[in-house]
């Protein structure tokens, strides 16, 4: 597969006093397209997608707070609304409207939230496994007492405070860990993602760029009814994508697709959670067909 791509330009912007990073793929006069990565990933996850679409769109891809080359927060404040706010700030500062947005996992949740809050600003939206926890998981969590969830959250934050970033003796060791986490990856993909997702320590070892605190999720129960209300306000054409080999449940089978006014669902065979990596060519075909429908 082709993995060598000419790189984008790096920029910074500020949101809630944080110095956040994004890349710009040029083509300033083309329609705007925003790409938002998932948890513990980074903006260069999108390089192959951006390379394919850059001739037709002005593409920007941010590093979410605590990820990639964006600043870490003080404390452990990595909530959904903060991520959404950061995206709102970036789009507002660049006046990037009307925008087509594509997000993966956490990023897929962020773009759906933003599209429901500001439906008038969105042209089209693609969410790759971005609907949050499956309904069955939400039901199981809601059965657990709030006091127990809070106690476990406090213990988790305390444990994270003593957790040092993992160090890999060589870059190849980090690449191997990347490929272990997603066996679907081509070796060249794994290397590319690792090169852009690590920094080299003073002793020569390598560590992931993301803040370990992004691993911690809110102890408050996922509010499905509020999510459904927000999704119902997404007036732009919406494409929900899922890998058939992923843990994510089918939004048609579990009923969540019913909350979107204008929606299409695509299940990609042979793909796990990272559909845009696992089956890149098929993913691009599906997305291109969807975007060309304008």
What are these regions (language model features)?
Residues 15, 54, 60-106, 138-144, ...:
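Active-site loop/oxyanion-hole signature of alpha/beta-hydrolase fold enzymes
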Residues 23-72, 76, 256:
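Conserved HGGG/HGGXW glycine-rich cap/lid loop of the alpha/beta-hydrolase fold
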Residues 271-284:
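Catalytic histidine-centered segment of alpha/beta-hydrolase-like enzymes
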Residues 1-34, 54-57, 96-97, 132, ...:
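Alpha/beta-hydrolase fold catalytic core
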Residues 97-143:
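Conserved hydrolase catalytic core segment
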Residues 123-169:
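Flexible "cap/lid" loop of the alpha/beta hydrolase fold
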Residues 198-258:
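Conserved serine/cysteine hydrolase catalytic core
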Residues 162-221:
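Conserved alpha/beta-hydrolase catalytic His-Asp/Glu region
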